[in-house]
Amino acid sequence: LFGLCLCLWTSLGWGQRMIEVPWYETTNTYMFDIIKMELTDEATVITGQVKYFPNEWFRVVGRTVLRGESGKEYKLLKAEGIKLNEQVFLPESGQMTFQLYFEPVDVGEKKVDYVEGNHETDWRIGGIVLDEKPQKLEKESDCLIRRKVLRHRAIGWC
């Protein structure tokens, strides 16, 4: 019975990696952050969080891709907790969390870029490290944004 449970437990976790608050190299947005990434054989799931002023709106566009270091683009398949291509108004808390499902990222990719589009206001997060323990660990940087000190786990950002 123990052997069966052990076999079942290991097979359920096979091919799946979870990265809590992944490190990244650059970003052009202070209101959207990736708080978790799950890499499975079926999909790459980003748990994103938007923090801004209550009742302000934002939009996640359906053309968003993850672009690997190889140049390959992984398409956005669906979203949960948010409607794509529509204005979404933040609740009174000023915070909203949702999941974005992308095509599965190839095993060989070490970093990806989150690319919403080519316009300068489109969200971009570059060099997202797909490793639970990145080799080059920089200390967290304190960033002064809109008179608030925020903590970012960015490599060389701020």
Name what the model sees in each region.
Residues 42-52, 158:
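Short, well-ordered beta-strand segments enriched in hydrophobic/aromatic residues
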Residues 122-158:
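Pro/Ala/Gly-rich low-complexity, hydrophilic intrinsically disordered segments
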Residues 17-40, 81-82, 142-143:
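Low-complexity, acidic Ser/Thr/Pro/Gly-rich terminal tails and inter-domain linkers that flank the onset
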Residues 33-43, 87-92:
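Short, solvent-exposed beta-strand/turn "edge" segments of beta-rich domains on protein surfaces
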Residues 51-87, 91:
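The feature marks short-to-medium sequence segments in extracytoplasmic or secretory-pathway proteins
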Residues 77-111, 119:
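Short, solvent-exposed, Trp/other aromatic-anchored flexible loops in extracytoplasmic proteins
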